[in-house]
Amino acid sequence: MLAGSVIAIGEALIDRLGPLGGDPSSDLPITDCFGGAPANVACALSRLGAKVSFIGSLGNDAFGEDFNNLLIQRGINTSGLQQDTLRPTRVVLVRRDSDGERCFEGFEGDKGLGFADQAISLEQIIRDWPLVAENAQWLVAGTIPLASEISSKAFLWCIENAMHSGIKIALDLNWRPTFWRNQVSTVSEPSVKEKNQILSILKNVSLIKLAKEEAQWFFHSSDPTELSSSLPQRQSVVVTDGSNPILWRLNNHLGKSFAIIPSSVVDTTGAGDAFTAGLIYKLISVELDQISEQSAKDIIQFGIACGSHVCKGVGAIEPQPYLDDIDNLLSLSKGGIS
């Protein structure tokens, strides 16, 4: 197990998957899977062998109890995991097309007060922070906590305290309009207010990962050099694009890495989160500002292998790889890097 540790903060929820090509709110069979980007990353890191703490909130319900048990079984430090007695664990309706690609259709379970992940308590985080931050090297975060007033305060406190404690921050700029607007929206692009709220935290991060579409919406470019140049500290940037090549800039090294396409794609729900976990796992043992060009290529390719492996199973967490799985996949893969 690696000596350093990672903190993941944000949503833990249930992905309700409908049948391929079907409606998860009405068509059978449905499959309920543990999910939420930060929770996915935490579980993937732990399975690879990293020490991980998770900060989030689950409902006082069967889903919350089962998710808590899963995190404990994975060996994740749950000192920062809160239980909300007023709000349920969020259930996300995920529609998948015939190729396994997914989109979010809305939520189930709200009783009028929202969901547990929208109400992460700052008071409890302040109390529990010493238990989760010890020996931490990285804080991994998404942007969904910014969408709710209560969780946003807790989230921003963690970002600030991590920065002042010398903990590097990796941000997955995962724009999901349904989470911000609490309904299925026909307008995918973020509003000026939503965009500014997310961009305001970028000055504190060391690594930003985002999809090509998100890069275009927030920066009007998917070129990692242009993105990095527009950031306050010219941070490292990784731009994903589904099964298309990944463009990246790590420690001033530029590259384009090609996907490892699994023979059978069942579900892509957790591929991006497994990719993120792979990057952070490799970065625990090396300083970001000291990596060589070859190390940068290897780090990206390791993440790609993690993402590819997850696509072979249902859900974001259950199919996550062990370290041996990735070593074997990389030894067999002919995925190229340029």
Where do the PLM segments sit?
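Active-site metal-binding loops of divalent metal-dependent hydrolases
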Residues: 12, 37, 144, 173, ...
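Conserved beta-alpha-beta core of the PfkB/ribokinase-like small-molecule kinase fold
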Residues: 138-226, 244-245
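Well-ordered beta-strand positions
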Residues: 80, 206-207, 236
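Conserved N-terminal subdomain of the carbohydrate kinase-like
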Residues: 51-143, 327-338
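Glycine-rich phosphate/adenosyl-contacting loop at the front of the ribokinase-like
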Residues: 1-77, 104, 337-338
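Conserved phosphate-binding/catalytic region of the ribokinase-like
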Residues: 1-7, 160-164, 222-338
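Structural alpha-helical scaffold elements that stabilize or flank donor/cofactor-binding regions
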Residues: 131-132, 200-201, 230
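Short, glycine/acidic-enriched loop or turn micro-motifs at the edges of active sites
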Residues: 14, 18, 60, 175, ...
